Amino acid sequence: MPEVKVPELAESITEGTIAEWLKQVGDSVDKGEAIVELETDKVNVEVVSEEAGVLQELLANEGDTVEVGQAIAVVGEGSGNNTSEAPAKQEAPKQETETSTDDKSAQPAEATSNDTDDKSQDNNQRVNATPSARKYAREKGIDLSEIAAASNDVVRKEHVDQSQTQTSTQQQAQPAAKEETKKLTQQNPSKPVIREKMSRRKKTAAKKLLEVSNNTAMLTTFNEIDMTNVMDLRKRKKEQFIKDHDGTKLGFMSFFTKAAVAALKKYPEVNAEIDGDDMITKQYYDIGVAVSTEDGLLVPFVRDCDKKNFAEIEDEIGNLAKKARDKKLGLDDMVNGSFTITNGGIFGSMMSTPIINGSQAAILGMHSIITRPIAIDADTIENRPMMYIALSYDHRIIDGKEAVGFLKTIKELIENPEDLLLES
């Protein structure tokens, strides 16, 4: 019988976790239909069946870690259950038990659910939603069309969960608080704590960050940039740039990205990595831009930055950031980069020592722009908008001289942005 196996995900991803089965044993499956949602350390992916038939066996449970190439389900011939009806029938007794011990109060709620079930299913079919969201909505008896009107996008499982939480908060607040207090009291009467499992993504991130710290000779060097000229140039070019590039705004990230490319060309060791006893120097410039999301920090890559102009870089950064926050990043967006830029300044960070990303040799940290007095010469002090920048690097590949030179190049280019803009 045909087996459903974990597909090749990406070069750096060898395993994942079963987040949710979208189909159950006995359900009919179409060719190309998603049957399971798999969580990796990068993104969540839906695994599809290569054959049409009936899901006959699940070879892994939700929460299990599975490897690339591992069989996780068996699909056989025949026609299976109508999955749009099965979950509703299975959920009914569970809802009765959880919502109330009073049979009289439970009956009206059950009747209401039955009356609206057909209408909700019809509405749900017209909504643009992921398979996991449809399944979850069916189980909870939620109309996806109401959620779609609020989300203005593809409805995902978290949207359904948020909707359910909002409608039931008042009813559940008091019992939930009592239950939480009970758990905390049992653990330690005088010192309350909350214990929860880390997501796979957080566990993987923690593991990789520790590996980087343990397996590299990481060092950080600093410099500062007078942002006066680049801020003035951006202000002068802002409106014209928007007109010339169909509404694209000129931000600071494109300046730093282009400056990083120029510095990487001048100091190729910063664009390298160690592979065993070899050093691999990359001849491409795929720059990662760190994006903060609800799931933590994600680093999608802007490809071929040396071949893109300012507007193209700004567009791609904006698109990748939106995809990251909407949980729509693909694996191709997240792997095989050459260098990373992170901007702690958006959170108010004045200075930091960023940790190198994966197999890369260095990471550039941007920070807050702070106006402070600067000595222009021996007799002149002026208030200038200043930014500290940091380069964390692997000292096994990059010497201190190259690291300092790299940051100095960034500084010179940002402080003389006209040249950078003209070169682009």
Curated annotation (Swiss-Prot):
A GO BP entry is:
tricarboxylic acid cycle
Q: Residues in domain Lipoyl-binding? A: 1-76
EC assignment: the record states 2.3.1.61
Keywords of this protein's UniProt record, alphabetized?
Acyltransferase, Lipoyl, Transferase, Tricarboxylic acid cycle
Q: Where is this region: Disordered?
A: 76-138, 155-204
What chemistry does it catalyse, as a reaction equation?
A: N(6)-[(R)-dihydrolipoyl]-L-lysyl-[protein] + succinyl-CoA = N(6)-[(R)-S(8)-succinyldihydrolipoyl]-L-lysyl-[protein] + CoA
Q: Could you tell me where the Polar residues compositional bias lies? A: 122-131
Q: What class of enzyme is it?
A: transferase
Instruction: Write out the GO MF terms.
Output: dihydrolipoyllysine-residue succinyltransferase activity
Stretches of Basic and acidic residues bias are at: 91-105
What is annotated as the active site? Answer: 395, 399
Residue ranges under compositional bias (Low complexity)?
162-176
Q: Which cofactor does it need?
A: (R)-lipoate
Q: What InterPro entries does the record tag this protein with?
A: 2-oxoA_DH_lipoyl-BS, 2-oxoacid_dehydrogenase, 2-oxoacid_DH_actylTfrase, Biotin_lipoyl, CAT-like_dom_sf, E3-bd_dom_sf, PSBD, Single_hybrid_motif
**What's in the GO CC field?**
cytosol; oxoglutarate dehydrogenase complex
Domain called Peripheral subunit-binding (PSBD): residue spans: 128-164
The free-text cofactor remark is: Binds 1 lipoyl cofactor covalently.
> Which parts of the sequence carry N6-lipoyllysine?
42
Pathway where this protein functions: Amino-acid degradation; L-lysine degradation via saccharopine pathway; glutaryl-CoA from L-lysine: step 6/6
Q: What PANTHER family does the database record attribute to this sequence?
A: DIHYDROLIPOYLLYSINE-RESIDUE SUCCINYLTRANSFERASE COMPONENT OF 2-OXOGLUTARATE DEHYDROGENASE COMPLEX, MITOCHONDRIAL, DIHYDROLIPOYLLYSINE-RESIDUE SUCCINYLTRANSFERASE COMPONENT OF 2-OXOGLUTARATE DEHYDROGENASE COMPLEX, MITOCHONDRIAL-RELATED
The record's note on quaternary structure and interaction partners says: Forms a 24-polypeptide structural core with octahedral symmetry. Part of the 2-oxoglutarate dehydrogenase (OGDH) complex composed of E1 (2-oxoglutarate dehydrogenase), E2 (dihydrolipoamide succinyltransferase) and E3 (dihydrolipoamide dehydrogenase); the complex contains multiple copies of the three enzymatic components (E1, E2 and E3).
Its biological purpose is as follows: E2 component of the 2-oxoglutarate dehydrogenase (OGDH) complex which catalyzes the second step in the conversion of 2-oxoglutarate to succinyl-CoA and CO(2).
NCBIfam families attached to this UniProt entry:
PRK05704.1, sucB
Similarity field: Belongs to the 2-oxoacid dehydrogenase family.
Recorded protein name is Dihydrolipoyllysine-residue succinyltransferase component of 2-oxoglutarate dehydrogenase complex
Tell me what gene encodes this: odhB
